[in-house]
Amino acid sequence: MVWALTPVDTVRGAQRCYIFAAGTYKVGRKDCDVIVQTDTSISRVHAEIVVEKMVAWDPQSGAPANPSYVRVVDRSKYGTFFNKVQGTQGSRLHKDEDAMLADGDTVTFGTGSATFRLSFVPIVVFFHGKKSGRISPSLQAVMTSIGAYATRKWSDECTHVLVDESCSLTPELLDAVLAKKQIVLGDWFKVMAEKNIHTAMPSSTQYIPKLTLDGMEIQVVEIKLIESCLAGYTFILGSSEKYKFGDKLHALLESTGAKYLHVDEFCANSQDSGAGENDKDILLVPAKSPLEFSKISGLFPLSKITDVKLFAAILSGHLEATAIEPPAYIVASSNSTDETIVVDSDVEIDTATSDHTVAASKSEHHIEHISDDKKEVVAISEEDAVNLVEAKTSINLHSYQEKDEIVKPMEEDVKVIEKTATMRGFKVEGEDIPVMTKVPKDETLDSRDETCHVIYTQNLVVKSILQSARAESIETGGINFKRFRKRGAVSGNSFKDLIPYSREPYRESDYKRGTVIDFMREEKKRRQMEAIAEDLFNNAKPKKKAAAGSSIHTMLTGRR
């Protein structure tokens, strides 16, 4: 066990000290192991705390070892008092006198209020290793030097858990986490033994091991970081026996600040209050049977996490988003694509269109669509059935002829594809025929919510309810990919845009129009005018200089 000197009153310059090894430790005002700066009655070296040896404490004995092997020796002028109670002097030690101290005794240095209490801090180590394994002799010697007691039996009196690196997670380790006992490596005890005396217990952050669970490596953190690491989350659980370490699961969730509900309770609440819309409601799925709750429709909107990943999140102190499986949204099975809106546009006259208008009623017909592996019955109206026959007629005009009246085609009917169109595929006499039926403009907005099939084919039949278009067969030739090109469209990088100053960009020469001859004549005239101006300017300079010189000479000589 480790000894601690704790100030009874909060006085200036007094701190708690931990003694980790046997030895002699000085108490005084300056340059001492225990510094006390309360009043002038404290000597420079006032007393000494002598620890003859460190004694281990066996929790089964119920009391610390006796004797404690801790003595106090007075080295001061004003004396040292032990077990001094308020209102009494206690036992005073004169210079060079000593006294044996026990757990809970108080020591007062000087005549002031510098009172410290001696108490033992037990270190009971639960050794979690292989059943046949033992603590190494070197580590055992270190633990003995600091008074640590090692045991292989877990109990609530254990203060620390000693494990090897990459040790497997067991129920005993989970019990230690629930009891807020730190899991450490053997190097932590070596660091403690090297300090001898210190104002705080050494940190175990760098000496926390990694555990393994079903092949997953878990980096354990300090116990204080595990607390409330899952606060705000609600886990939906099944029966405890379905999960790994199921008997520890509820207690672990409570210790981390999380809530939990049973599957039946959650389903009952979801029907009444619409539960399950919260992102922090997570379904806990057993790793050994991931499809355990796949048949319960009320759990479909929930995110999922396996019990193994949940234990890893608890021991690591945080729940990563990658460990959570997002909910599986149900998408209705349909053979239709998204709604397609085709804006009115100009189409070239050579676009292959055909339309034959016939009378139709609203009675329903059924046409079988036989695929390679299944048969699908599609219900269509008689109008669609007539459109189907007309589509077949437009593809093979020589094979099938309609007896109904054929309206004279018009070129404006090429623009028959407007706001919304519906494509249906049918199989008639062994040949697939796509039919596109135009929806009138005055259709209600609800029709836009319906799904549509828009499939391109060179034999596409475009039907207009109001007008019909001229039909041209293209079966003899290949696919005309320019059929949808706008007439008169000009590229953005045209010659006209790049060279805007050219009158006729495709004319190689302008000699025929006389523009070059006129330009040369004007240029020659301009140069002649510049030469004349230059001569006049140069001839005017000497005259000005001569006139200026004669006038100065006249002024100097006084002649006129």
Swiss-Prot record:
SUPFAM superfamilies: BRCT domain, SMAD/FHA domain. Pfam families: FHA (PF00498). CDD domains: FHA_NBN (cd22667). One of its GO terms (cellular component) is chromosome. Keywords: Cell cycle, Chromosome, DNA damage, DNA repair, Nucleus. Residues 115-190 form the BRCT domain. Belongs to the Nibrin family. The FHA and BRCT domains are likely to have a crucial role for both binding to histone H2AFX and for relocalization of MRE11/RAD50 complex to the vicinity of DNA damage. This is Nibrin homolog. The gene is NBS1.
